[in-house]
Regions:
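Sec-dependent N-terminal signal peptides
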Residues: 5-14
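N-terminal secretory signal peptides that target proteins for export/translocation
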Residues: 1-2
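Acidic, polar-rich low-complexity tracts and alpha-helical solenoid repeat scaffolds
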Residues: 17-304
Length: 304
């Protein structure tokens, strides 16, 4: 969720690309890797096990099984005391099941960590969300009293931060610090207010901003958040399309891009962009020159 955690989002995304041609991995593969790691706890074996868990989490469609895999990953990361990895998996758990007791514990822990690290906007949004998600929790009243009154209007606060993206811009036309902060608060809002009508829109704006920052792993994770948890939202088709477009043009992964484009056509066959997506699939991997030549050649063909 927080911007500095995007490295693991990128890691999980790259893993999904490597395994895109496979079905859900068998659980006994995880058991084998886990046994290997326990008998020889090297960083390499840890990474292999974590990658397999990450891959399975991305592919698993059953909510209960996915939750078990996430918790298993968190326990593994606890052994190495890697807070960033723990938090990243914890955030996935909160997305999946925000009302669980485990999610509640991690949400408060992450909020407190953000507060300690000076990310006050993120911390306060998470804490306000905590009090709204768990109003009967014994800690909620005290937390509520610690949140500044400016956070009573979160949408206004987020919009104000959005305007600051272009204050004192750098050579790329944006204020990087404010842009990263905007991404953070949009994610924070969606995490604690998953059912709010504005959440998917905030995630989409955050994805576009992270792409402007060239943080492609983060962008992919945000598009996936939208398509996974908000499949019926108006932003979902565009999020899926832009994921494919980013894969093709920024990450130079035409095979994965084609897979995403085909998924788009399967899910949204009557979408206004279907014709454009078909064109992209037909010409994927071709240079602009080759595409132009093909178009010109088509124009010269006699009409039937």
């Amino acid at each position: 969720m927080m911007y500095r955690l995007s490295i693991l989002c990128c890691l999980l995304f790259l893993i999904s690309c490597k395994n895109s041609d496979k079905a859900v991995e068998q659980m006994d593969e995880i058991a084998i890797l886990e046994t290997t790691y326990k008998s020889n706890p090297t960083l390499e074996n840890f990474n292999l096990l974590l990658q397999k868990l990450g891959s399975n989490i991305l592919e698993e469609g059953d909510k209960t099984k996915k939750e078990a895999l996430i918790i298993r990953s968190i326990e593994l990361c606890k052994e190495t005391k890697n807070t960033a990895y723990i938090n990243t998996f914890a955030i996935e758990l909160i997305k999946l099941n925000p009302k669980s007791e485990v999610s509640k514990t991690y949400l408060l822990s992450i909020a407190e960590e953000m507060k300690s690290s000076g990310k006050n906007e993120v911390a306060n949004i998470l804490m306000k969300g905590y009090t709204d998600l768990y109003p009967d929790d014994a800690k909620s009243e005290g937390i509520k009293n610690s949140i500044p009154a400016t956070y009573n209007n979160l949408n206004g606060l987020i919009n104000d931060l959005g305007t600051k993206i272009f204050e004192k811009p750098d050579v790329n036309g944006i204020n990087k610090v404010n842009a990263e902060k905007y991404v953070d608060v949009c994610e924070s809002y969606a995490l604690v207010y998953p059912n709010d009508s504005l959440s998917a829109g905030y995630l989409f704006k955050a994805a576009e901003m992270s792409r402007a920052l060239n943080s492609y792993g983060k962008t992919i994770s945000l598009y996936d958040w939208i398509t996974t948890y908000y499949p019926n939202d108006k932003n979902a088709p565009m999020a899926l399309f832009l994921k494919g477009f980013l894969l093709e043009n920024d990450l130079k992964n035409p095979d994965k891009a084609k897979e995403i484009y085909e998924s788009f056509l399967s899910k949204y066959p009557n979408h206004a962009m279907s014709k454009d997506v078909n064109f992209l699939i037909t010409n994927i991997g071709k240079s602009d020159k080759e595409i132009i030549e093909k178009i010109e050649k088509t124009k010269t063909l006699p009409s039937k």
